[in-house]
Amino acid sequence: MTWALISVLIAFAIYLIYNGIAIKLFGVPNSLSNTFYLYKQKKEWMRIFFPIMMLLLVVFLMPAWLEISAASALQFLAFLASGGILFVGTAPAFMSSDLENKVHTYSAIGAAVFALLWVIFVSKAWFMIPIWFAVIALIAWLTKTWKSALIYWLETVAFMSTFTSILIYFLI
C-alpha cells in the first residue's frame, strides 16, 4: 500500500466522519460550509472544526492527486482544486463578511469545477460523476432535503466523485 493510497483513505475517513457527525448533530446542512456556523452555535470554539477539516483534506488528498497526475499536462487542476478548498477553509465566515463571502463562494465553485475536471480528464473515471449524482439525488429525494440542502448535495457529488476516482486508480 503506497503513501498516496493511505493518504487518500485518511482524507476520505476525515470527510466521512466530519459529515457523519455534522448530520447526526444538525441534520443535513444547507452546505458543507454552513457547518462552520452550526458548530459555532453549539460552542464557539467548535467553529475551528470546519477550517481544520478543509486543511486536512488538502494535505491528505495532494499526494494522491500528484501521483495520479504526474504524467498529465493537466496536473495544475489538482493544484487549483486544492487551492480552492484551502481558500474555502480559510474564509469560513461567508455570512459575516462581504469579502469572505466572495472569496469563499468563488473558491468553493472553483474547487468543485477543477476537481470535477480533474476527475474527467486526468483520472479517466468520469463515469463516477453521473453515478454519484444519481446516488446523491436519490438520497436527497428520500430524505426530502433536495431543496433545502441542494448545495450540500452538489458538494457531496464533487467530493465523492473525486475520492472514488482516486480509489479506483489505486485499487483497480
Regions from the language model: what does each represent?
Residues 1-68:
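N-terminal topogenic module of multi-pass integral membrane proteins
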Residues 4-8, 70-79, 125-132, 151-155:
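Membrane-interfacial loop-to-transmembrane alpha-helix junctions, especially the N-terminal start
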Residues 17, 58, 86, 164-167:
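Hydrophobic residues within the alpha-helical transmembrane core of Major Facilitator Superfamily
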Residues 38-41, 65-73, 96-102, 144-153:
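Membrane-interface helix-boundary motifs at transmembrane edges
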Residues 121-172:
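Terminal transmembrane helical module of multi-pass membrane proteins
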Residues 77-131:
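Membrane-proximal helix-loop-helix units in multi-pass membrane proteins
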Residues 56-58, 110-118, 135-141:
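Hydrophobic, membrane-inserted alpha-helices
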Residues 38, 42-45, 49, 91, ...:
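Outer-pore/vestibule module of multi-pass helical membrane proteins
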